């Protein structure tokens, strides 16, 4: 998954529930897109929608301002070379891509997006605008934050639902039709396997892992002796690497997925 964690249910189970609630078709996003950052995730999602002859794309966002999203996307397309030049300059300061993107957008048009659903929503619109896809984007207001612990009626964030499920708190059933006979697997259950792999691999081998940025292999080696998954992620997280980025790379290490010749990043 995009957040670098395992899905709590397989595709067929989730598809079945969607169909029960009136969805006509459900498409599975390729692994190469589903486990990437927002811009690549969105590219894959919109491409899949186009191939399915979808002409309206509906998504949730916190600000619910689709006109602003189109304005930003069109500005980036018109000033693409300058935009990426500014992004590269910001990245050299040792900050994450998301933060660099925020700063550049504020410079270019005086607006930026910082909330999780807004960021993904912008990437959907960017994919539509950049490729001139015949798709209309429509936004729905998110009433609960992506990581929020608060609930609104029967609506809760994905993060909060996952927390309830893994705490074996049956209150999760108020917010999702999913039911579990046994506890879903979690990536932290595989931390010892991850440690063995990192300890066995040399720096050059780690560099070949998909999404492994320059210097990250040394960071992994430095902190691999930490006893818990949470401690390792916290130690590796910085201004440059978000926790989600670290988790995604950990997933690729576990699956031993190497960088392709045509990188998606």
Question: Could you say what each language-model-derived stretch is?
Answer:
Residues 20-30:
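A glycine-rich helix N-cap at a beta->alpha junction
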Residues 1-14, 20:
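N-terminal catalytic cores of NTP/NDP-binding nucleotidyl/phosphoryl-transfer enzymes
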């Amino acid at each position: 998954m995009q957040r670098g964690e395992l899905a709590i249910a397989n595709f067929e189970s989730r598809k079945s529930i969607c169909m029960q609630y009136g969805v006509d078709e459900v498409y599975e996003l390729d692994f190469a897109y589903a486990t990437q950052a927002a811009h690549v995730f969105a590219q894959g999602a919109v491409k899949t929608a186009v191939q399915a002859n979808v002409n309206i794309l509906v998504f949730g966002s916190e600000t619910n301002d689709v006109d602003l999203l189109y304005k930003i996307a069109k500005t980036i397309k018109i000033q693409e070379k300058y935009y990426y030049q500014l992004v590269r300059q910001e990245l050299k300061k040792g900050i994450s891509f998301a933060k660099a993107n925020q700063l550049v957008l504020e410079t270019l048009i005086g607006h930026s997006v910082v909330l999780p659903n807004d960021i993904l929503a912008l990437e959907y619109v960017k994919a539509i605008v950049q490729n001139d896809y015949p798709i209309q984007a429509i936004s729905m207001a998110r009433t609960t934050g992506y990581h929020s612990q608060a609930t609104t009626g029967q609506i809760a964030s994905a993060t909060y639902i996952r927390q309830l499920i893994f705490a074996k708190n049956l209150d999760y059933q108020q917010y999702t039709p999913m039911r579990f006979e046994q506890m879903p697997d979690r990536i932290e259950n595989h931390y010892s396997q991850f440690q063995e792999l990192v300890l066995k691999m040399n720096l050059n081998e780690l560099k070949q892992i998909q999404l492994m940025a320059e210097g990250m292999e040394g960071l992994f080696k430095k902190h691999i002796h930490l006893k818990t998954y949470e401690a390792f992620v916290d130690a590796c997280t910085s201004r440059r690497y978000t926790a989600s980025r670290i988790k995604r790379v950990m997933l690729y290490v576990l699956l031993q997925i190497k960088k392709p010749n045509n990188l998606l990043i």
